[in-house]
């Protein structure tokens, strides 16, 4: 597999112990909004991150949740050795995987799943699309909505973008995700059958949202998520 060399453009600590890392590929690095990359660094393995920038930008942006020994070591490594190898972009969670339509697009994320939402939203803006975008970003604390100001600014600046920040301190995942589901249905229950969705979060969250929306008439084939590939349901 051919890798691409990239250098560190900048690294910034955001709120919620999340770091924004922007890498500058030294040669062309093609990707589609919604795909992910893998960093190739000696001493590390399984460094998969969703690309948070859109393809029109000159760098590859990553959102890294620190706190674990592995992620903390990675941040320290990038600060010391600002050059990495990138495997080719991969992943099928892209809008070209869905039927072409101007119907509302639900962009649903928890935690650093916002990276995927950001890439897709910015790609739509770069293409001057007027398609309605409804962003639902959930977390158990406000600090973990680390780019909420950006998402809210989109909603202020563009009439076709709507942002909902959902904070739940519930520890049980069914209770935690019910607020998210209720918020989506309160906005779209009457026309949920025509909506499409991109869902970025844990398998429990993704499947809970999918099942609840399908019960109300949503077409399951119109939701995309990386979860469907890395954690598929058993038949």
Task: Describe each model-derived feature in a short phrase.
Residues 34, 113, 202:
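Short, conserved phosphate/pyrophosphate- and ester-handling motifs at nucleotide-, phospho-/glycolipid
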Residues 2-82, 141, 169:
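Ferredoxin-reductase
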Residues 2, 71, 140-235:
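Reductase modules of NAD(P)H-dependent flavoproteins
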Residues 73, 116-119, 208-209:
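Phosphate- and divalent-cation-binding pockets in alpha/beta enzyme and binding domains
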Residues 61, 85, 106, 132-136, ...:
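A structural signal for isolated positions on well-ordered beta-strands in alpha/beta enzyme cores
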Residues 45-52, 91-99:
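Short, Lys/Arg- and Gly-enriched loop/turn segments at beta-strand edges
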Residues 114-126:
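Histidine-anchored nucleotide/phosphate-binding helix
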């Amino acid at each position: 597999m051919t890798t691409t060399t990239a250098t560190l453009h900048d690294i910034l600590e955001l709120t919620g112990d999340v770091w924004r890392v922007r890498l500058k590929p030294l040669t062309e690095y093609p990707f589609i909004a919604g795909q992910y990359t893998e960093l190739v660094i000696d001493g590390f393995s399984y460094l998969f991150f969703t690309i948070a920038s859109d393809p029109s930008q000159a760098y590859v942006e990553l959102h890294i949740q620190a706190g674990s020994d592995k992620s903390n070591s990675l941040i320290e490594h990038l600060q010391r050795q600002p050059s990495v190898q990138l495997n080719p972009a991969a992943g099928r969670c892209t809008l070209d995987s869905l039927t072409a339509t101007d119907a509302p697009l639900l962009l649903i994320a928890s935690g650093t799943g916002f990276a995927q939402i950001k890439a897709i939203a910015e790609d739509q803006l770069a293409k001057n699309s007027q398609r309605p975008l409804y962003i639902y970003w959930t977390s158990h604390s406000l600090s973990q909505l680390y780019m909420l100001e950006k998402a809210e600014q989109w909603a202020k600046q563009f009439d076709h973008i709507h942002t909902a920040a959902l904070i739940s301190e519930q520890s049980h995942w069914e209770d935690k995700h019910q607020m998210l589901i209720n918020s989506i249905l309160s906005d779209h229950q009457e026309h949920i059958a025509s909506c499409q969705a991109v869902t970025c979060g844990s398998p429990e969250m993704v499947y809970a949202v999918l099942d609840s929306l399908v019960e109300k008439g949503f077409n399951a084939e119109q939701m995309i998520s990386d979860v469907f590939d890395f954690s598929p349901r058993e038949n």
